[in-house]
From Swiss-Prot:
Matches recorded under Pfam families: Herpes_V23
Role noted for this protein: Structural component of the T=16 icosahedral capsid. The capsid is composed of pentamers and hexamers of major capsid protein/MCP, which are linked together by heterotrimers called triplexes. These triplexes are formed by a single molecule of triplex protein 1/TRX1 and two copies of triplex protein 2/TRX2. Additionally, TRX1 is required for efficient transport of TRX2 to the nucleus, which is the site of capsid assembly.
Signal peptide limits: none
Subcellular location: Virion; Host nucleus
Organism encoding this protein: Psittacid herpesvirus 1 (isolate Amazon parrot/-/97-0001/1997) (PsHV-1)
Stated name of the protein: Triplex capsid protein 2
Length: 321
């Protein structure tokens, strides 16, 4: 059974009173799994962590939206399941020790592996409670090193789906729908193929963000570093770039244009808009990088066990890194 010391931040999740005996039994499989809470309080209700809590304006979110919600939520490790409540500990604050969690992902977790959390793909650990209309879906545990490839393939697959639904010709490789690790593969079809409106909104936002970041980055380099195109530099790497004999560099070297001041488009003298735009570009680039960066939530530590690999459904000791 999952357990933790009193130094952990303990949370009680109240269960509805009209659950059937069969539903109570099925809830017991949640022991050792991780639920994501929108806020951190000592007492929560089941509807705070069920699938409906991720809905946006009454519609089910796509995978990218669920992933963004995971970044804002707090992971709770379920330590015990009672008749009236779930006992859990927070992995975000406090000093939980002696943790025991369940591997809810398809990949093996090795001793010393960092473990990240993503929205579930497939219904392997889904618990449907018809009596109260709730669906509980624990987070999927995956090795942190697999996370970046998995997220990249999900977004690439969503891009292909976006092109297909908008009659944009594009070749779709079969490998975009699966990610493999240690001779085990995970099918990403369910995460990639969402609703039409959700996919349209998500991909348009993603494309706009990427294009804006690329355009702003080039604009800042051209504005703040005109000497890079016109003159030399003592840095060997920059000299190698300047010796590429591009048409832009040659024309700038011949004419040697003066550096022109960039005025504030609003006409005010309170700020220099190029530096504000540069700061905004750095912020957006950082956020795009954060989308693909998986932070570890747990680290597998098997002190007194001969087992070195934890398969799906098995439990393992862990610490918070």
């Amino acid at each position: 059974m999952a357990h933790a010391t009193s130094s952990a931040y303990e949370v009680k999740i109240t269960l509805p009173g009209n659950l059937t005996r069969d539903e109570e039994d099925r809830l017991r499989c949640l022991t050792g799994t991780i639920l994501m809470a929108p806020s951190l309080r000592r007492c929560l209700f089941l509807h705070d962590v069920d699938r409906n809590s991720y809905y946006v304006h009454g519609s089910e979110p796509d995978y990218a939206t669920s992933l963004a919600a995971y970044r804002r939520r707090f992971p709770l490790l379920v330590t015990a399941v009672g008749r009236q409540e779930l006992s859990a500990v927070s992995l975000s604050i406090g000093c939980p020790k002696g943790l025991n969690f369940r591997n809810t992902g398809p990949f093996q977790l090795l001793n010393g592996s960092n473990v990240s959390l993503i929205p579930p793909i497939g219904g392997r650990w889904r618990v449907e409670l018809l009596s109260c209309g709730s669906v509980i879906e624990p987070a999927m545990t995956i090795p942190t090193e697999v996370g970046s490839e998995l997220l990249g393939k999900i977004l690439a697959g969503m891009t292909y789906e976006f092109c297909a639904r908008n009659q944009i010709p594009a070749d779709r490789p079969a490998e975009v729908y699966r990610v493999a690790c240690d001779n085990k593969a995970l099918d990403l079809t369910q995460a990639i193929r969402g609703g039409d409106s959700d996919l349209q909104d998500t991909m348009k936002t993603l494309f706009a963000s990427v294009l804006f970041a690329m355009n702003e980055g080039v604009l800042q380099v051209m504005t703040l570093m005109p000497a890079l195109l016109a003159g030399g530099n003592t840095n060997p790497f920059l000299n190698a770039l300047l010796q590429m004999q591009s048409a832009t560099r040659l024309s700038a070297q011949i004419f040697n244009p003066p550096t022109l001041p960039v005025h504030d488009p609003t006409g005010g003298a309170r700020r220099y808009n190029v530096f504000d735009a540069f700061a905004s570009w750095l912020t957006m680039s950082h956020r795009l990088g954060e989308l693909f960066h998986m932070k570890p939530a747990l680290k597998v530590v098997m002190f007194y066990s001969d087992v070195s690999a934890i398969d799906e459904g098995q439990t393992a000791n862990a610490i918070v890194p």
